[in-house]
Structures are given as structure tokens and as C-alpha cells.
Amino acid sequence: MSISKYSIRFLSDKATRFVPKSGVYPKGYAVGGIHCGVKKDGKSLDLAILQNTFNKEASTAGVFTQNKFKAAPVQVSMRILKQKSGSGINSFVINSGNANAVTGSKGMKDAEEMVTVTDSVLENPKDSTLVMSTGVIGNNLPIDNILTGIPKLSLNHLGNTHQHWIDCATAICTTDTFPKLVTKQFNLGNDTYTLAGLCKGAGMICPNMATLLGFFVTDAPVSPNALQQILRYAVDRSFNSITVDGDMSTNDTIVAMANGAAGGELIDNTSSSAERFSALQTEIVDFAQQLAQLVVRDGEGATKFITLKVNDALSYKDAKSIASSIANSSLFKTAMYGKDANWGRILCAIGYADVSTDQSVIPNKTSVKFVPVDGSEPIKIIWLMVNSKKLTKIELQKYYKMKIW
């Protein structure tokens, strides 16, 4: 990672481990980030733009917060995405340091202005930009700084190099200790495609997404309906399956864009495209999980990274409910913080999980297993019924010994 005046604060152990030093990025995109004056330190990047440069017909999908106090940029982006039916959105504009949430009509006007100015500078048709904000709730944006910064960023600081992507990922950060950026290439038949993703998190992380912004872009050709279906499926199995502090924010937004710049046959959610659709969905789920794990690793005050695996549940919904019940248990969290393999607290959380039927959790057919990440034998196994033919197994995979970051 190159060092600059705005990335110096990311020189931490986690930044060294998790920030990529290089990457291969999808074709047909220009990204970047600058300091425009939202953050008050005078140097931290706080304005980012991601632009599709390949054509004006990119497919876009989005998943947004379930909080009833949706921030102004969330409301504006939801309106535009619905109005466009996921087609013809060509850019994202994001500010950090101010959430533009609970800001009334002034906040709505500011969000709309960010869209209008970005569209004008990038020569987009009207309402071709989604807008996102993250930061402090309840304060009006320094909108003049942002509207001045958008042309400066658009005309002078966009590109597709690794540093441009690092700048973009850095500019959306708030309390994060490192920028979160992942890239991968994959093959669908004879076609090679690239995915790039960036996100921010740190505090208020809980299903269904919180203080979370995330962006997936690819050069694969994907229809809007297929992209929306894949994104929702992937988010449910990644960003909606993590928790740090159990709070849900007002600004959560995960968006995806596919511009088709790498060519190939259109991927749709029809029977004729079923194989390619399934393969792409698998790639994006894996990709989303990588990004979501970075959010957990950077959770405010987090000292552990734990994966919960529920096996042999009656349904995916039940498995997720059981895992969420354990993960959000304060008693379980304190036990893990204290390095105490207190399996009783785990069973307690399983017992009050919101499952579908009385048969979803059968006490005398339930086991708990603690699994070291190095693949060695479980450090403790609790069998409540050793001779049962089929057990519901709860596995906890601990990735790091206790470490204060």
C-alpha cells in the first residue's frame, strides 16, 4: 500500500494484513476519492465517486437498510433505482463524515443536489447517480464543500489504477481502521470476468446491515433482474449474517453494478441462462462473504473473529436464527472475550432462538463443538446424546487468539 497524507492513519496491524498492495480491476470503471471538507481534519478523504465509463446501459441493483428512519440519501437512491428499474444508472457518489440522516427537507434537497451535480459533471442523463452518505447522524451536510468537490474529483482524480481504488475505499471510511477492498477474477465458460468490491463498517453492525456501505462492480454482462436477485441472495448470506454490536443504522446501502465491458453472453435469471446465473451467484456470494468478514475484523472494540456453523438444521432460516441468537448473546460474547469455553451459554442461546417449529431444536439431539482454526481436533465437544443418529451440531471456529487491536 502506498503511503500518502490521507492514508497515514491506516498504518496499523490490520491495515498491514488486510489492505491489498495490488489488484486487477474490472474494465470500464473510473473511481477515486479526495478530501472536500466534510471531515474537519483538513486532510482525510471524504468524497468518493465510482463511474461506469463503458456505456450508459449498466445494470444496477441495491439492498437498503430496514431501519424506519431511512437517511435522505437512502430514500433518494431507492427512488432512482426503482424509477430506472435497475438500468441506466452510471455512477455512485459517496461522502463520509456526515450521514445526512434525520435532517428533514434540507437533507433531501442536499442529497438530490449531489445527484444532479454528479450527473451534470459526468454528462449522465438525469437521475443516473445513486447517492450515499455515512457518518454523524443529525447534522446537515456542508453541502457547498461537497458540490465544489464533485467537479474537482470527477475531472482530475478518477481512474482505474490500484491507487484510485484505494483512494475510493479510503474516502468512504469513518471509524474504520483500514480501507476494505477486495478483487477477484473468475471464469464463466470461455469468458473471464473481474469483480471489485469495497465497503465500510466498524460500528453498529448487525443484521440487517448497519452503518454499512458496500459496492460490488463487475465487467460481466448481467440483466438488472438477475443482478438484483443475486445481490439480495448474496447479502443475506454475508452482510446480513454478521454482527458486532447489535445496532442497526439509518444509512445501510449495498449496491452492485454490471457494465458488460468484458463481453460474453448476457446472464439472466431465465432457464436458458441458468448455468451461468448459478455460477455467477456462487462467485458473488463468496466475494460478499470476504468483504463482510473484513467488516467484522474491523468492528469497534472487537478482539475476536468467530464463525458460527449450524449443521443439520431443518431449513436455512432456522440455521440462521440459531446462529444469530448465539452471536447476539451478551453472555456468549463476554465468555468469548474472556477465553471461556462456556458451552452452557451457547445452549441457552440456542434454546430461545426464533425457530420455525418445536422440532427445529431437539435438546437431546444437539451438540456443541469448539473448532480451532488450524484444523486440529476440537478443543471441547459437548454431546447431549452420544448415540443419536442425527445431531444438530453448532461449530464455533475461532480465527484468532485474544488480541487487542
UniProtKB/Swiss-Prot annotation:
The alpha and beta chains are autoproteolytically processed from a single precursor protein within the mitochondrion. It is found in: Mitochondrion matrix. The record marks 210-211 as: Cleavage. The keyword Transmembrane helix does not apply. The keyword Metal-binding does not apply. Pathway: Amino-acid biosynthesis; L-arginine biosynthesis; L-ornithine and N-acetyl-L-glutamate from L-glutamate and N(2)-acetyl-L-ornithine (cyclic): step 1/1; Amino-acid biosynthesis; L-arginine biosynthesis; N(2)-acetyl-L-ornithine from L-glutamate: step 1/4. InterPro entries: Arg_biosynth_ArgJ, ArgJ-like_dom_sf, ArgJ_beta_C. Signal peptide: none annotated. It catalyses: N(2)-acetyl-L-ornithine + L-glutamate = N-acetyl-L-glutamate + L-ornithine; L-glutamate + acetyl-CoA = N-acetyl-L-glutamate + CoA + H(+). It comes from the Eukaryota. GO terms for cellular component: mitochondrial matrix. Belongs to the ArgJ family. This is Arginine biosynthesis bifunctional protein ArgJ, mitochondrial.
